[in-house]
Each structure stands twice: as C-alpha cells, then as structure tokens.
C-alpha cells in the first residue's frame, strides 16, 4: 500500500531536507505550496509513494530564476504540473514541480494581472483561452499584495472533457457556488486564497 507524507509550515531548509530524504525512497511531490514573507517562506507539501515518470522540482527562486528553470525543463521534455508563489509582485519567490510524459498540449504563465478577457497576458484572458481551446487548470496561484495581485497558472489539455468553472469572488458568494456545484456532483479541483 502506498504511503503519504505531508507537512506544513516548513522552512526552505526543512523542505529541502525532506526532498533529499523522501525522493530516494520513491516518494513524489503531489502538492506543494509556498507562503508567507519571502525572507522566511514556509512550505507545505504532500508526498505520495508511487511510481511515475521522471520529475523535478524547484523552490525559493525568483521570477527570473523560475523562468530559466521552466525553459530548461521544457527543453528536456518536462511539463509544469504544480506552481506556487508568495511575496510582492516584484520580488516574489516560486516553487514548482515539472514532470515528463505529458504528451498532450499545455501552457503556463506567471506574473499575470487580472485584466479583461480580451487583454492579452491577463489571467482572465488565459482562463478564457483555456476554456475556449479545451484546456483545464492543472495548478493556479495568486501572489502579490492587495493593490497588485498577480496570478500564475498551468493549463493542460482537457482530454477527459471534465466540466470546470472558475470564480474570483468573496467568501459568501463562493460558498453559495460551492454548495450548488457540490449538489450537482462536482468538486473543487484547484483552490487558492
């Protein structure tokens, strides 16, 4: 039977220690988030003991370093599957997981502002593109501050034709939408606050 390992509130050093400890034992990162102040970022992760394609991960890197890691991974045939970020837009730090073996189409962006559906490079435009072109969010995150929110996302081809929707709303409205959709046999797939 596969084992799961999870932790939260881990420092970058503790997260790296767990990475070195769990990876050789056959565990894979299946969830990863970074939060808090960039000078003392905290990590939460879920590790699943199971086989799968080759994978790699990065954490504690700035936007330029993330872009380099992303470009290198894509050149090597890895697709992004998890992204998380914390901190102000201009000095955020990122954590991400990349995996080989994703033969269907995907796209990813970070540093997006909210914007309108016709505003190239905005989060709303990316979500509309995904919906219109048959993609589904694989991983989404919000970072920045209330006056300058930024978004990062990874979208993969929706090969299973899974119905999906997305909301950027206050908690009371979200709860009403959640209750209605759960009543219709849907479940949350991605949530970020």
Predicted ranges, named:
Residues 1-193:
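Terminus-proximal functional modules
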């Amino acid at each position: 039977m596969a084992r799961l390992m999870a932790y939260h509130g881990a420092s970058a050093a503790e997260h790296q220690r767990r990475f070195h400890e769990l990876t050789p034992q056959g565990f894979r990162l299946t969830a990863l988030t970074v939060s808090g102040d960039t000078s003392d970022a905290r990590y939460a992760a879920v590790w699943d003991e199971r086989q799968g394609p080759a994978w790699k991960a990065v954490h504690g890197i700035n936007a330029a370093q993330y872009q380099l890691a992303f470009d290198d991974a894509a050149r090597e045939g890895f697709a992004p599957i998890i992204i998380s970020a914390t901190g102000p837009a201009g000095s955020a730090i990122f954590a991400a997981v990349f995996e080989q073996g994703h033969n269907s189409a995907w796209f990813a962006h970070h540093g997006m502002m909210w914007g309108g559906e016709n505003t190239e490079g905005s989060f709303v435009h990316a979500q509309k593109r995904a919906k219109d072109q048959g993609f589904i969010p694989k991983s989404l995150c919000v970072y920045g501050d209330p006056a300058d929110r930024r978004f990062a996302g990874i979208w993969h081809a929706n090969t299973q034709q899974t119905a999906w929707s997305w909301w950027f709303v206050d908690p009371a409205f979200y709860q009403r939408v959640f209750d209605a959709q759960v009543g219709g046999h849907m479940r949350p797939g991605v949530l970020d606050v």
